[in-house]
Amino acid sequence: MIRYNNNKKTIEGDRMFYTYLRGLVVLLLWSINGNAHYHNTDKIPNQDENYILVAPHRTWWDPVYMAFATKPKQFIFMAKKELFTNRIFGWWIRMCGAFPIDRENPSASAIKYPINVLKKSDRSLIMFPSGSRHSNDVKGGAALIAKMAKVRIMPVTYTGPMTLKGLISRERVDMNFGNPIDISDIKKMNDEGIETVANRIQTEFQRLDEETKQWHNDKKPNPLWWFIRIPALILAIILAILTIIFSFIASFIWNPDKKREELA
């Protein structure tokens, strides 16, 4: 069912599952780490404003921390098409707003779809301007989408464990939000305009990383906290198993792409 909210569309089925799955993954991360800290969240735009949330892509789990810190706002995000080959995982990320991108042969829909969603729905967009976890170069996709959708760019950085072992050993996680970037002053989004936006984003990433150093340390919480988190971890695992079973069945019934076509 599609509901209209402030003249923008919301897909209720996707919204409910998005909220549930975000909560489940956050519970799992809290159970195995429980040492996350969020800074400058007052800079996040209000819920009525759509924006592009951008960050350097450093781990598999930084998108979850980004989505949790900005709740109840919900997002769409780009994902390489290979992630959609698994029936259950592919259905999960589609229900949570992911849309496939062919990195070898990108199509016009890679730009058109997020622009339409930012304009027509109440969802914002998560992007990693570097494109992958193995690159630090800011590319121009976020600039083009922000300009055409007439939205601001919201930078955030993740500082924390880069491996699953570090996450489980409860190394500190810091999410630091920067100043929203307004690009309305850039009249033409040509090569020069794209480079200007990329430089603004990269400069803010560097500033945030430097600022985070004052909070980030190697101190780990008291290991006795595991006695509290073990029951939560067991609960999260049980819920995850039930969710996998439900998702497998639901993937034959509910097609997220069908409703998404109505939205876009």
Swiss-Prot record:
Its EC number is 2.3.1.n4. A motif (HXXXXD motif) lies at residues 57-62. It is a multi-pass membrane protein. It is found in: Membrane. Its main location: membrane. It catalyses: a fatty acyl-[ACP] + a 1-acyl-sn-glycero-3-phosphate = a 1,2-diacyl-sn-glycero-3-phosphate + holo-[ACP]; hexadecanoyl-[ACP] + 1-hexadecanoyl-sn-glycero-3-phosphate = 1,2-dihexadecanoyl-sn-glycero-3-phosphate + holo-[ACP]. This is 1-acyl-sn-glycerol-3-phosphate acyltransferase. It comes from Streptococcus pneumoniae (strain ATCC BAA-255 / R6). The gene is plsC.
